[in-house]
Structures are given as structure tokens and as C-alpha cells.
């Protein structure tokens, strides 16, 4: 909730939370036997509620939502009176679901909510099929935030690193690839399997990177029309500094904007570029007066023993203290990872495989 700090700044908490297969029984996720017992489901609900009640986010993005009605009930019970979800998970077979969706909950009014679609013309220009779609539709919710006014909050869950296809997919598809043009009964050799695996993984990277680039274009289009501050939250399924996601934050350009003094500060070239820029909230925190020390960034996901930061909150120039038009700055950055690095079966067995991330914004008077 909105609070006042000792230095006369108002504080607002923004979070992102991958729920990890949030689906109410008796429905199943992906396979017919992936069904929570009532005890497991209640334990999962309690774990999420405990996080929400302890950390008190004002706006929170959710990923991996199969049961949006149950999530809305839970978040409203925790004081988040406004909720938005627009897409629906895919029904594979009766009670078996795939393709979970994203959602957003807020303490403050959601004035508008839309699903973001890929621009078909730009997708074609990029060499993609004109019917290109996001693997999971991003959500844009315009929230009326105290002291800030209308703010466009985007929730994403980009394509995972899981290969788009594997050898079994190729064998099952009668219309594909020269790899199958071998004598009947001949197995694919190791080299062919390795090459196919590389193709499948690169296919996922192309999808993920294209989603990032097309989302940024959609955000810039919206920003041009409304000038609303922007917050992008979600599970990126990749490292932000990796080239695949560079389109989200890159300001490298050959474009030389024309200065227009009649537009005041916005006529300045640096301000024109900065106005459409997104920055990692962690970097903004590290550069702020509130940063305590330079520390290694905590991972938000572990694959065996290897940790990676996959969950992010990106912010527009209004949240950059060094920007002349700044309205707020990042006063705190938190990664809730206790259940990942020191789990307790009693408390964490139905938690999540990601660490929720949360920032505290110090809003100027």
C-alpha cells in the first residue's frame, strides 16, 4: 500500500511472480495425472497469500495462470481489489490444460486492459509469417496510480528456451525436412539429432527475440499516443543482457533525431531517445542513493545448480532519477528466493520454481 517514508517520498511496490502451474483441482496441467490434491492446492494458495500479505505489493504481475477466477479471489482477499486477465488457457483434452496465461492485480483502479498483438506488417518485414503471434499474449493494464496518474503496466511471459521441436516431432510430421529422406527404418544418426536440436533451440530464440522486439514496438506506439509512464514485468525466460532480448533496452541507433526547441525538453535529442527507453529496475536501484553496496544479483530461477535471472521489471524514464522529467526512483529491489536456496518441505513444497521480484518506488512530491 502507499506509504510515506521519512524523507517525504511516497512509496509504491511493484512485483512480478511466476506462480508455477496455478491450476485448481480437479483440472490438470499438461498431463492427465498432473492434478493437485486438495491439500496440495490449499498449501499452494496459502504460500501465495503469505507472500502477498507479508510483502504487500501494490501492483503485481502473474505468470503461469491456469485458474484465473481462483487467483482473482485470492488476490482480492489479500487487499488487491482490482484484477485483470484477458486470455484463456488452452484446453487440450476435457480437463487437461496447456498454455497458461498472464494476469495483473492492483490495489488501485485498472482503467483499461487489452491484450497486446504483434503488428502483422512489421512481423512480415522481419521475415516472420504475417500470422506471427506471441506464444503467450502480453497484457497491458492502465492503472491509475497515486501521485503518478495513469501508468501502462505490461505483463509478459516470453517463449521458453525449450526447443520448438525435436526428433519425435519431425518423425510425426509427414510434411517436414530432408532429415527424413533416408531409407525406411533407418534411424537418424547422432549428427542429425544434434543438428535438429540446435534448430529447435534456435527456433525458440527467434520466437522469444521476435516477441521482445514486437512488444517494444507496440509499447513505443502506445507511448507516442498517451505519454503514459511504462512498467514491463514478467518472466523473460532469458537473460536480459543476452542478444536475443537486446531489443527491449537497446538505445544503440543510427537515427539522429531532429532537435525541435519548440518542444522544450522533448526537443533535445537525448530526451527524445530517453523518453522511449526502458531500463532494468535493478540497474536503476544500483545507481540510486538507496543502494547499500555492489552485490551479485540474486538468481530468480535455478536449473539444477545453475542460477539465472529470468524475471524482470523494466521502467521508463519517469523512474530514472537522472532524468530531468523523473517522477520517482527505485528505492529498493528485492528477490524472494528463500524457497529456492534453503527450502523447507513443510512450508515450500507447493511454492514456485521462480523467485518473485519486487521493487519499491520512491515517488516525489
Language model features with spans:
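Metal-dependent phosphoester-hydrolase catalytic domains
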Residues: 1-4, 115, 124-127, 131-134, ...
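N-terminal, active-site-proximal structural segment of metallo-dependent hydrolase catalytic domains
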Residues: 1-82, 87-102, 187-191, 212, ...
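Beta-strand-turn-beta hairpins that frame and shape the catalytic cleft
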Residues: 5-14, 134-193
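Acidic/histidine-rich helix-loop elements
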Residues: 20-42, 162-204
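Second-shell loop/turn segments in exported
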Residues: 34-38, 57-62, 198-206, 232, ...
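Structured beta-strand-rich core segments of catalytic domains in phosphoester-bond hydrolases
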Residues: 65-166
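Acidic, His- and aromatic-enriched active-site or binding-groove loops in soluble protein domains
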Residues: 80-92, 174-182, 256-257
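His/acidic metal-ligating clusters that form di-metal
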Residues: 182-189, 196, 204, 208-232
